[in-house]
Amino acid sequence: MTSIPVSSFLLAALVLQYATSDAVNYCRLPCRGDNYHVGCGEPAYAQECGQSPRTRELLKEHRNEILSKINDVRDHVAKGSWGLPVAARMKVVVWDAELAGLAKRHTKGCVGETHACRNTERFWLPGQLNFKYSGDKLPRIKELIDDAVKKGHLQKHNITREIIGNYRENGPNGDVKELALAISDRVTAVGCGLTTWQDGAKARALLTCNFSSQNTRGRPVYKIGNSPGEKCIEKDETYKNLCPATEPIDPNKSN
């Protein structure tokens, strides 16, 4: 008797979770100041895109590669590696189609940092990372992903225990923004987009990843514990130091 409404509820929840940017009128979402929403209007290429711009499809293998790299780092940090404190409740990150759709639209501007807002009805203040490539020849998508991850991974030399407890974008030895965002315990989802183009003799690419949350200056990157995942309802089977993807963490709630 109760199976029908329960099934209907689950279906509605799945539709909401995996909604794409095409299903929402982003022109109606509020943006700070005079900024425009990246999802508002037609997603045309900008003049900065040079010749032959092309937005690339991130296949399942690419999405899995991104998730694997991010969750590996989160699992590593959560257990107290690199001299960082143990994370009490950091969860496995999942792919989100809506964040990916907005990231894809962002890459069509062919400029890394912009003032366009990217908030959604579910994610009020998403974080964003941009990786720009320039070279004689365009590498494979997997190689672009690996290069982007390596850039963030190198920031382990810059991030400190003090930054985990009191976030700022720069440590004593340099930038920590990419790594700090990847290990935020309020991040629950990520979605990425990729556009490539030709600029004279140079091949260029912009890989953008939107995260469900962003770090706030002066606030903790994650909550510290005595043992990894001590505040999780249960532990993930693959990433032993993380909560599973089902852990009910609110990405809009500040630490």
Curated annotation (Swiss-Prot):
GO function terms (MF aspect): toxin activity
GO cellular component, as recorded: extracellular region
Disulphides: 27-40, 31-117, 49-110, 192-209, 232-243
Matching Pfam families: CAP
Organism from which the protein derives: Tabanus yao (Horsefly)
Keyword terms: Disulfide bond, Hemostasis impairing toxin, Platelet aggregation inhibiting toxin, Secreted, Signal, Toxin
Protein name, per record: Tablysin 15
Annotated family: Belongs to the CRISP family.
Function of the molecule: Anti-inflammatory scavenger of eicosanoids and antithrombotic protein that inhibits platelets aggregation induced by collagen, ADP and convulxin (GPVI agonist). Exhibits high affinity binding for glycoprotein IIb-IIIa receptor (ITGA2B/ITGB3) and endothelial cell alphaVbeta3 (ITGAV/ITGB3) integrins, but not for alpha-5/beta-1 or alpha-2/beta-1. Accordingly, it blocks endothelial cell adhesion to vitronectin (IC(50)~1 nM) and marginally to fibronectin (IC(50)~1 uM), but not to collagen.
